[in-house]
């Protein structure tokens, strides 16, 4: 019999209580916690143990914590509302509905009752457990009632909840205990209830107890369930993985050669599927020997930050709670009053110790990874380490809660069923023999650490196998080509579902995207097949910019802009075509027919590749598998290639009638005309061509997402293009290839949207970027240069000319200000121009201009009059020399802005007169207190008084004006800390010269020490 246990607790929105609850859950045998009023601020690692999953309601009033690695958790989005959170959990104990709700005392109870009705209705015959802070008392859940209870509000709420429980035919698990579930020194009651439906009542027997808790007004409830019938548990082997940190590659090679040599002489003539299976087994065995299997260990139940002081503080709180209970039993009001005062003091001290210890642990953790910008801290802050759960799905208005059924729905959504089987293809000629260099080229191009397929073998291992036994692998691939057979094991991907966006409805199957993780050896064979077809492939349409080496989004947009600008027509109408599930719906018969038309010599192998395919979703509780009969496998080598050769047919048909741009499945048609009627007629004609092609290959268009917009000219009434019996939507702006374009080919809307898009990224990382104990300055610069700036500057060669406008520059400055405030330890009132210099970040409009000119020089396009290097003789310069010259122009333009006395940031200019200081030195950094002096914005009465944060501008020394210069150069209160000569500060008449301080590391450290000591002393004063 498999036990099932969980905790129920109300944290009172306390950080210390939530931290300690996480520790209790990790240390105990419980798997889940039904929590009311949790603390949800801060970082994941700052509050809860690593690996613990959290599901909350919309208000953050209730949460479910999951500390069971093997449990499948399916959030029920339709039942995760303002009133509670619901989860379907599946594991060795079976399938159970868990629900947590906080029934707010000053809110009516009826909405919560309706919510619980919905939970019970959805659970039906599945066991359901509801953990409530009901703020209600009743004999039904054995509340210990006084004789005055009937007149109280929580008693009337209890009567209402009791009536509902009788009508709903549910039961309370509460048992009689001496300890109250609620005890806040002033009052005691039993207002917490654990409710189960009929299915849960029959499913198990329960032990329900209350344990005293020092950190909340509520005590902790622990429930242990023992199922009445034992279940046979099927063990699902996880995808194997190995440790590469201490890999012994020489031993790996020796073992591979030895194991292959032990195979029978006639093994090369055995069935291909058997050879593939044997190769996998050998590779697994050798990896176990030379690399070592990466074991899935349960998280440590020990809290490394728990100290002896915490234990002592907890003992003191428990001692005082016992004294309080003794005093209440004796009705000794005087003793109770004294103990309550002591208990409050001890509880506050204990909570403070817990918060400080956990924060110190988080700081140590961040400090240990401070120099790794893309490591564990980054992934935690960005949410990259959180598991992607398959939630409950809605199909035809009905909610599906079984994990297996949901997995099948997703697989069917990812891989639609073909209406007809692919025809048998017969190879008309014998494929040429496989050359070793073909395999070597394909293996070398593998990404080493890409996620593996079901066999767990990644690119690193494949390359090692190729180095060890090249003849054996080449022979295996050669036989596949010769026999025209693609091994079945290599055609079965492991499918991972990803939510398309945070704003998508998690209950809709269409909100997910399926990624196929294929076996790496199969990818090598696919690459060989694709390369062979490319050898006989004629040149495709020149306006396809996706899947083309050396082409990019900027190329596609430049073609669009030049076509619109060069058009002799009065109007140009852009038709942005959207294919519904483009890659997923391709008919294999169309792909085979196209391959045959191209003269492919491996038709038998391609036919085998497109037959007998399967797709698998695997978890700890089961495996779901469906046959695949159509579509280009996303994540495969051949998928983009197949789409490319099919879409080339469409582009060739459209090319005589219009200008166009295609990037993978993103298609833009440019319809030219001198009147609305011409635009409408030509637009309908072109859409008819697209529709015909879609029917041939099995794809259809999305009539709601295919939109039109005027890119040139203006009409009083927008054109109406008919397609599939309806008008295509006309829009004022449209996002194409990651860039938002507005009517008339304008990009100000795109620039205006950048700040909002970056808010989430900055918010997730700001806490470890801004903090003095967070990332190192070099890591911060790496994240800025490698993540934030590229996100903002994506497609800069397309829209950089718009950045010359004053409105656009203001928008870009606002966006950059948001980013730099998230990266630098400064006051939020510091000017943007000063932030740019302190962060070594050039203004974004100048950075965009730099990227645009680099793009033009790379492609050989002519420079325009406002471009840097325009008119200069750069023909004799190398590429590196050109980049250096461009950087000089960037710095000069930036320096000119910085030297403008009308700009703010003049205090910072006195310390850093040249913009290259931080720009050239990625390790340049400073603390918050140092920034007070460098910017003049900080803890100075003159500064604070100007913002109504201080009653006076005077210093404590008596000087009438306390500002940064007074603190640094004159205040007698800090004379013993001041060393102006050591800092290199000079005085010329009435002026102080500070510009040499930050040029020297020793002086910079002295300034930092001075700032720390001064502002600590000032705070004490």
Curated annotation (Swiss-Prot):
GO terms for biological process: DNA biosynthetic process. Pfam families: Exo_endo_phos_2, RVT_1. Residues 479-741 form the Reverse transcriptase domain. SUPFAM superfamilies: DNA/RNA polymerases, DNase I-like. Gene3D superfamilies: Endonuclease/exonuclease/phosphatase. Keywords: Transposable element. The keyword Signal does not apply. InterPro entries: DNA/RNA_pol_sf (IPR043502), Endo/exonu/phosph_ase_sf (IPR036691), Endo/exonuclease/phosphatase (IPR005135), RT_dom (IPR000477). This is Putative 115 kDa protein in type-1 retrotransposable element R1DM. It comes from Drosophila melanogaster (Fruit fly). The lineage of its organism: Eukaryota, Metazoa, Ecdysozoa, Arthropoda, Hexapoda.
């Amino acid at each position: 019999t498999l036990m099932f246990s969980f905790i129920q607790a109300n944290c009172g929105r306390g950080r210390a209580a939530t931290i300690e609850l996480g520790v209790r859950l990790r240390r105990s045998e419980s798997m889940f916690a039904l929590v009311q009023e949790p603390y949800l601020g801060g970082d994941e690692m700052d509050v809860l143990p690593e690996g613990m999953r959290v599901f909350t309601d919309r208000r953050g009033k209730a949460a479910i914590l999951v500390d069971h690695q093997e449990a499948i958790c399916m959030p029920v989005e339709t039942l995760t509302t303002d009133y509670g959170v619901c989860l379907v959990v599946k594991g060795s104990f079976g399938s159970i509905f868990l629900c947590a709700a906080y029934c707010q005392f000053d809110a009516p109870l009826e909405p919560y009752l309706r919510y619980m009705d919905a939970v019970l209705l959805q659970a039906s015959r599945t066991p359901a457990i509801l953990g409530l802070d009901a703020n209600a008392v009743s004999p039904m859940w054995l509340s210990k009632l006084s004789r005055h209870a009937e007149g109280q509000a929580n008693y009337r709420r209890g009567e209402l909840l009791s009536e509902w429980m009788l009508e709903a035919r549910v039961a309370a698990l509460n048992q009689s205990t001496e300890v109250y579930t609620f005890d806040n020194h002033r009052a005691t009651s039993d207002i917490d209830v654990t409710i189960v439906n009929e299915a849960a009542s029959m499913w198990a027997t329960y032990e329900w107890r209350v344990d005293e808790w020092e950190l909340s007004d509520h005590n902790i409830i622990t429930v242990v369930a023992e199922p009445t019938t034992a279940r046979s548990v099927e063990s699902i082997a996880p995808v194997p993985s190995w440790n590469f940190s201490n890999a012994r590659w020489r031993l790996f090679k020796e073992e591979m050669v030895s194991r292959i040599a032990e195979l029978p002489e006639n093994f090369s003539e055995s069935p291909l599927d058997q050879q593939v299976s044997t190769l996998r087994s050998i590779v697994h065995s050798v990896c176990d020997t030379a690399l070592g299997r990466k074991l899935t260990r349960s998280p440590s139940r020990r809290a490394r930050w728990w100290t002896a002081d915490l234990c002592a503080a907890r003992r003191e709180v428990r001692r005082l709670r016992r004294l309080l209970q003794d005093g209440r039993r004796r009705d000794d009001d005087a003793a109770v009053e004294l103990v309550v005062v002591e208990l409050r003091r001890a509880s506050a001290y204990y909570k403070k110790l817990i918060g400080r210890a956990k924060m110190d642990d988080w700081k140590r953790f961040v400090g240990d990874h401070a120099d790794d910008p893309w490591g564990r801290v980054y992934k935690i802050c960005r949410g990259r380490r959180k598991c992607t759960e398959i939630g409950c799905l809605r199909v035809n208005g009905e909610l599906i809660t079984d994990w297996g059924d949901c997995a099948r729905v997703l697989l069917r959504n990812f891989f639609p069923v073909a209406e007809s089987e692919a025809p048998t293809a017969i190879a008309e000629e014998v494929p040429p023999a496989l050359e070793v260099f073909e395999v070597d080229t394909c293996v070398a191009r593998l990404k080493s650490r890409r996620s593996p397929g079901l066999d767990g073998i990644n690119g690193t291992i494949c390359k090692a196998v190729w180095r060890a036994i090249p003849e054996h692998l080449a022979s295996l691939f050669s036989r596949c080509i010769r026999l025209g057979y693609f091994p079945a094991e290599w055609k079965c991907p492991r499918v991972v579902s990803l939510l398309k966006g945070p704003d998508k409805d998690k209950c809709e199957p269409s909100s997910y995207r399926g990624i196929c993780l294929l076996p790496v050896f199969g990818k090598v064979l696919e690459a060989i097949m694709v390369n062979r077809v490319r050898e006989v492939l004629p040149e495709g349409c020149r306006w396809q910019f996706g899947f083309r080496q050396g082409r990019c989004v900027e190329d596609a947009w430049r073609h669009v802009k030049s076509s619109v600008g060069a058009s002799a027509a009065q109007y140009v109408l852009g038709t942005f075509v959207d294919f519904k599930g483009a890659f997923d719906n391709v008919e294999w018969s169309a792909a085979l027919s196209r391959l045959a038309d191209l003269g492919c010599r491996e038709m038998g192998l391609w036919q085998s590749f497109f037959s007998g395919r399967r797709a698998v979703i695997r978890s700890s509780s089961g495996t779901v598998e469906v046959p695949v009969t159509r579509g280009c496998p996303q994540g495969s080598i051949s998928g983009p290639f197949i789409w490319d050769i099919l879409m080339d047919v469409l582009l060739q048909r459209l090319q005589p009638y219009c200008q166009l741009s295609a990037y993978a499945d993103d298609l833009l048609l440019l319809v030219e005309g001198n009147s609305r009627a011409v635009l409408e007629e030509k637009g309908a004609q072109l859409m008819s061509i697209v529709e015909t092609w879609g029917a041939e290959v099995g794809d259809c268009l999305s009539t709601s997402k295919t939109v039109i917009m005027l890119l040139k000219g203006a009409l009083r009434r927008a054109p109406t293009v008919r397609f599939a019996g309806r008008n295509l939507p006309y829009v004022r702006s449209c996002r194409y290839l990651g860039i938002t374009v507005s009517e008339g080919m304008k990009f100000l809307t795109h620039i205006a949207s950048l700040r909002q898009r970056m808010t989430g990224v900055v918010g997730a990382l700001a806490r470890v970027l801004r903090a003095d104990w967070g990332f190192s300055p070099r890591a911060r610069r790496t994240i800025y240069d490698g993540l934030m700036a590229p996100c903002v500057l994506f497609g800069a060669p397309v829209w950089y000319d718009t950045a010359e406008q004053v409105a656009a520059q203001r928008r870009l400055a606002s966006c950059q200000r948001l980013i730099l405030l998230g990266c630098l330890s400064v006051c939020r009132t510091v000017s943007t121009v000063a932030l740019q210099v302190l962060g070594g970040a050039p203004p974004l409009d100048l950075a965009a201009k730099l990227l645009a000119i680099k793009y033009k020089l790379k492609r050989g396009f002519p420079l325009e009059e406002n471009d840097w290097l325009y008119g200069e003789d750069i023909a004799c310069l190398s590429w590196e020399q050109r980049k250096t010259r461009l950087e000089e122009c960037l710095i000069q333009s930036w320096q000119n802005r910085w030297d403008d006395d009308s700009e703010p940031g003049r205090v910072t200019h006195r310390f850093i007169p040249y913009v290259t200081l931080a720009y050239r030195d990625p390790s340049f950094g400073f603390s918050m207190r140092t920034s007070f002096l460098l910017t003049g914005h900080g803890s100075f009465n003159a500064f604070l008084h100007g913002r109504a944060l201080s009653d006076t501008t005077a210093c404590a020394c008596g000087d009438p004006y306390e500002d940064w210069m007074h603190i640094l150069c004159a205040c007698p209160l800090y004379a013993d800390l001041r060393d102006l000569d050591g800092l290199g500060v000079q005085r010329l008449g009435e002026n102080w010269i500070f510009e040499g301080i930050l040029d020297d590391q020793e002086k910079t450290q002295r300034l930092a020490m001075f700032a720390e000591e001064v502002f600590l002393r000032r705070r004490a004063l």
